[in-house]
């Protein structure tokens, strides 16, 4: 815990002033002038309290040692086990820019459009449970430099003949992608982290544990190599698209560009922490999440459905459907069969899509971080 040099009170990171604030005497301090001394940059570890949920095994870090009363990941109301640990320092951190009040306001605006959501999700006491958590990310810096040799062609028609001319296209490539980011926590769903993006990397600062005071941090347990291929693929896809739209090669149909032709290379991988306001909702064995980007205020929520509200909405929707079916009695038999077939296929498609989506969420089949952890067991 950080203590005020003036009165000994507890210091927390104040989002509004972007400085450390004493809760007792209201004195402000520079986050980089506290606690770690001149050797902070040379110290590769920092001391934290690790809280572990006895139900789901999820872990969060804190510079404070006050007991955490609930788990952000599974929603369980329980006292988390704690221990002191030495954690590896990330290279950079984006401090929280959006306050808890701003987070709650953004969430409330989102909930106005969620007519089938359970009423508990609008309860002020529930919304007040938003917890500020720094999520670990890997930031990849990727370069593409070298000579470029591509095969292109142009097709034209001359009388009864279709003529295809082949060309050898050359050029010099110089591209650089800064900070392609992927979350480094198996507890943080990849889909949520992707939808919360982007973060403005200009807001990154050198890491100091002072920024964690008053907040929590998730543990980093997914290796950078899990996402390195994805980062290089993203860079290659973006470069390929730009080459195709470049005026130099306009009018040419190019063969598929292979990654090795672009000289894609990962130059640097930085460990970072990005701010997320996190809220979980537990109903029996189901857990849903609402998250807010702590820098931009973007809301990403997996909002559950209240069966009673949904049933009422379905009954109201049944009225125009009944009218449609009544009108269908006047259709020709062939038209009626075709309409019924199309509606049936649409229903089957929606049902299958939802089944696959639920299965992927339950098993984490499309989450690279979770699959990585499972492969280690």
State the predicted function of each range.
Residues 26-33, 74-82:
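Short Cys/His-rich micro-motifs in 6-15 aa windows
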Residues 10-12, 30, 61, 79:
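Short functional micro-motifs and their immediate structural scaffolds
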Residues 1, 17-19, 46-50, 68:
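Residues immediately within or flanking Cys/His clusters that coordinate Zn2+
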Residues 331-344:
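Hydrophobic alpha-helical transmembrane segments
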